[in-house]
Amino acid sequence: YCQKWMWTCDEERKCCEGLVCRLWCKRIINM
């Protein structure tokens, strides 16, 4: 399973998929 803090858009270590992943990555980048 994956926790929120594990989410990543890294293809090799991808924990999340699709829109949720993209939104989370944008949130991190904007911080």
Curated annotation (Swiss-Prot):
The modification Methionine amide is found at M31. Potent and specific blocker of Kv4.2/KCND2 (IC(50)=34 nM) and Kv4.3/KCND3 (IC(50)=71 nM) potassium channels. Acts by altering the gating properties of these channels. The lineage of its organism: Eukaryota, Metazoa, Ecdysozoa, Arthropoda, Chelicerata. Keywords: Amidation, Disulfide bond, Ion channel impairing toxin, Knottin, Neurotoxin, Potassium channel impairing toxin, Secreted, Toxin, Voltage-gated potassium channel impairing toxin. Expressed by the venom gland. The keyword Disulfide bond applies. The presence of a 'disulfide through disulfide knot' structurally defines this protein as a knottin. It comes from the Eukaryota. Its main location: secreted. Belongs to the neurotoxin 30 (phrixotoxin) family. The primary structure of this mature peptide is identical to that of kappa-theraphotoxin-Gr2a (GsMTx-2) from Grammostola rosea (AC P60273). Coiled coil: none annotated. One of its GO terms (molecular function) is potassium channel regulator activity. InterPro entries: Huwentoxin-1 (IPR011696). Pfam families: Toxin_12. One of its GO terms (cellular component) is extracellular region. It is found in: Secreted. Disulfide bonds join C2-C16, C9-C21, C15-C25. This is Kappa-theraphotoxin-Ps1b.
